[in-house]
Amino acid sequence: MAEEKALNDQMLARRQKLATIVDDLHLDPFGKRFERTAKAQELHDLYDNSTLETLESEQHEVVIAGRMIAKRGAGKVIFADFRDVSGKIQVYAKRDDLGENYPIIKRADLGDFLGIKGIIMKTEAGELTVLATELTHLTKALRPMPDKFHGIADVETRYRKRYLDLIANEESFKKFQLRSKIISAIRAYMDSQDFMEVETPILQTEAGGAAARPFITHHNALNIDMYMRIATELYLKRLVVGGFERVYEIGRIFRNEGMDPKHNPEFTTMETYAAYMDFTDVMDETEGIFKAAASVVSDDLKVTYQGTEIDLGSNFARKHMVDLIKEQTGIDFWQDMSVEAAQKLADDKHVKYEKYWGVGHIINAFFEEFVEDTLVQPTFVYGHPVEVSPLAKRNAEDSRFTDRFELFIMGSEYGNAFTELNDPIDQRARFEAQVAERENGNDEAENIDEDFIEALEYGMPPTGGLGIGIDRLVMLLTDSDTIRDVLLFPTMR
């Protein structure tokens, strides 16, 4: 109650100052267009190495604008810190220099936006400063800013009111700048590899391309239920059928599933498809993407995640799923075995399984139980069973497995790729097997997408496809332990 009263008192005081801006200073409290000549960081880059004497003699005039985040002094002299998108810089305001302009900064509260024209200088302590010669009021903040020393204590508030988090937490602000730069670096790499960026439907009549539970909505004009997409895969493959040999899409995906530090119902992925490539080529492509992204934050392509150094500059390891299981458990799934034999092995090792599972499902469960957490450095795990890979091409040497890989780092999956299944007959059989699983209780199994099968019947060249979780990659590169820290507006109750 006391905190609420203090907040109300501060807001009342700011409203009163708002009135004085109009009545006494005859200014628009919410400003208008303002043209600046530099941002804060540009000034630091240009003049940080200049001496006090040099700046005093050269008299460089600049015009800046930003939010006031600190203020010291209240008489004839005021020092204040202003922040813009690039960083912060100190402003030195003197009543004798500014005259009738001086009340603009004297009456300003933390959070207000001002425009400042002035001369670049350095203080005796060596801090780069703008000596104000003219002030412009741009926006009055009617609510007090979060405490700059304690920030926002309530984590929920940080996520619900991200704008406050960005104001109070410079680390968070920079993290989202890095996210943008990482995605830009990925796009630049894809451009260099002759990929074309495309956009595919978010509202779809079939929820396909992944094993996930969709969000369902209703299209009133068409009077049909539709699904928020759970993957971009099937539409991108249609484009390969149509003749676009290298395509990719970065966009939002929606899955109506649980939430935890690594999962949000709405998240960003990148999927790529390249004609005449197979999954080994896609491994090379994936390394290129990760190296391009890592270059944004690290010159040597090494990053530290939760205290562990991850080397993204070296060649990523490549290991078959069955070999990794044998290394960890001694069990050899290369040998042919019945479902009953696989179930007994699972029982012996206390691995849970569903009644409808085949041997391939159990192999995958062994991998998840005994191997995933051991994969710290970047590792391509390939050779997934057919049962858990309905869209991947069978391996030519052992048809129980597919030409598919997942990239694991720190025990988490960062990418999923395969030589795409382009045989429409086999694809239909895989979809039908998925339908059977759904009837036996797997509500994440895929439906039959007749239009996609028809597209394959027109012929899709051998193709390598890749899916990467952008949010998880940003988490890795910014050392964030929860996906909510890299989503500007995460899903909240």
Swiss-Prot record:
<comment type="subunit">
    <text>Homodimer.</text>
</comment>
<dbReference type="InterPro" id="IPR002313">
    <property type="entry name" value="Lys-tRNA-ligase_II"/>
</dbReference>
<keyword id="KW-0963">Cytoplasm</keyword>
<dbReference type="InterPro" id="IPR018149">
    <property type="entry name" value="Lys-tRNA-synth_II_C"/>
</dbReference>
<keyword id="KW-0436">Ligase</keyword>
<keyword id="KW-0547">Nucleotide-binding</keyword>
<dbReference type="InterPro" id="IPR004365">
    <property type="entry name" value="NA-bd_OB_tRNA"/>
</dbReference>
<protein>
    <recommendedName>
        <fullName>Lysine--tRNA ligase</fullName>
        <ecNumber>6.1.1.6</ecNumber>
    </recommendedName>
</protein>
<dbReference type="GO" id="GO:0016740">
    <property type="term" value="F:transferase activity"/>
</dbReference>
<dbReference type="InterPro" id="IPR012340">
    <property type="entry name" value="NA-bd_OB-fold"/>
</dbReference>
<keyword id="KW-0648">Protein biosynthesis</keyword>
<keyword id="KW-0067">ATP-binding</keyword>
<feature type="binding site">
    <location>
        <position position="406"/>
    </location>
    <ligand>
        <name>Mg(2+) 1</name>
    </ligand>
</feature>
<dbReference type="InterPro" id="IPR045864">
    <property type="entry name" value="aa-tRNA-synth_II/BPL/LPL"/>
</dbReference>
<dbReference type="GO" id="GO:0000049">
    <property type="term" value="F:tRNA binding"/>
</dbReference>
<dbReference type="GO" id="GO:0005524">
    <property type="term" value="F:ATP binding"/>
</dbReference>
<keyword id="KW-0030">Aminoacyl-tRNA synthetase</keyword>
<dbReference type="GO" id="GO:0006430">
    <property type="term" value="P:lysyl-tRNA aminoacylation"/>
</dbReference>
<dbReference type="InterPro" id="IPR004364">
    <property type="entry name" value="Aa-tRNA-synt_II"/>
</dbReference>
<dbReference type="InterPro" id="IPR044136">
    <property type="entry name" value="Lys-tRNA-ligase_II_N"/>
</dbReference>
<dbReference type="GO" id="GO:0140096">
    <property type="term" value="F:catalytic activity, acting on a protein"/>
</dbReference>
<dbReference type="GO" id="GO:0004824">
    <property type="term" value="F:lysine-tRNA ligase activity"/>
</dbReference>
<feature type="binding site">
    <location>
        <position position="413"/>
    </location>
    <ligand>
        <name>Mg(2+) 2</name>
    </ligand>
</feature>
<dbReference type="Pfam" id="PF00152">
    <property type="entry name" value="tRNA-synt_2"/>
</dbReference>
<keyword id="KW-0460">Magnesium</keyword>
<dbReference type="InterPro" id="IPR006195">
    <property type="entry name" value="aa-tRNA-synth_II"/>
</dbReference>
<comment type="similarity">
    <text>Belongs to the class-II aminoacyl-tRNA synthetase family.</text>
</comment>
<dbReference type="Pfam" id="PF01336">
    <property type="entry name" value="tRNA_anti-codon"/>
</dbReference>
<keyword id="KW-0479">Metal-binding</keyword>
<dbReference type="GO" id="GO:0005829">
    <property type="term" value="C:cytosol"/>
</dbReference>
<dbReference type="GO" id="GO:0000287">
    <property type="term" value="F:magnesium ion binding"/>
</dbReference>
<feature type="binding site">
    <location>
        <position position="413"/>
    </location>
    <ligand>
        <name>Mg(2+) 1</name>
    </ligand>
</feature>
